[in-house]
Amino acid sequence: MRESVAVKHPVGHKASQADDVIKSFVRSIDTAKRSEQPYCNWSLQACFPADTVDDILALPFEAPSLEGVSGKRELHNNTRKYFDVENRKDFPVCEAVAQAFQDKRLTSHIVKMFGTNLKGTYLRIEFAQDIDGFWLEPHTDLGVKVFTLLLYLSKDPSHKDLGTDIYDGDKKHLCRSAFAPNAAFVFVPSNNTYHGFEKRPIKGVRTSLIINYVTNEWRAREQLSFPETPIT
């Protein structure tokens, strides 16, 4: 059994609570900006309470080395981090965020706003830490993922150009989402939702959460927040 790791915070810091995350994210959904080009997507602001963002950034996970290889996240499956069962036990912020996105109050709002069907799916939250040399080839997420939320977290001003790259159906680069702390890019995967990350300099660590709901066909159950509990 792993020992729980204490994370230090400044005086006056409010510990992350699921209810606060739910309220904050519902507000961000209600004020989301929708775009139809090149596919339906949404831009969200102020997704989480500020203290929750700080709690996530304080997680004691080192950014893994790329060892000269990039292009697909699955190339580094052995070093990826998730808000999984173990990390939910060890870190209150992982538990708070996972409980929020498992909660009917939030899932029903996601269904209503984004038009996806979450019934019978499972929550998967990846804590992504990208370093210089990272890139991702264009891909759609179509298949076992029925919802994708890319939540940007790192606060380095130089990261403002490190948003998600967006492509058309022929994988031609069109534009890039804005990268700002606590902002997000959302889409419902389909056969044309091409996105990726063009290789460019990354100063420090580009930190984000990748939040998906996946179908029961998802094989890597250890990555799931609640592997035995589907969304109802």
Regions found by a protein language model. Give the residues of each.
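Fe(II)/2-oxoglutarate
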Residues: 1-37, 174, 223-232
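Intrinsically disordered, low-complexity segments enriched in small/polar residues
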Residues: 10, 66-69, 161, 194
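Membrane-targeting and insertion segments and their boundary/processing signals
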Residues: 13, 18, 22, 26-30, ...
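Catalytic core of non-heme Fe(II) oxygenases with the double-stranded beta-helix
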Residues: 89-102, 106-228
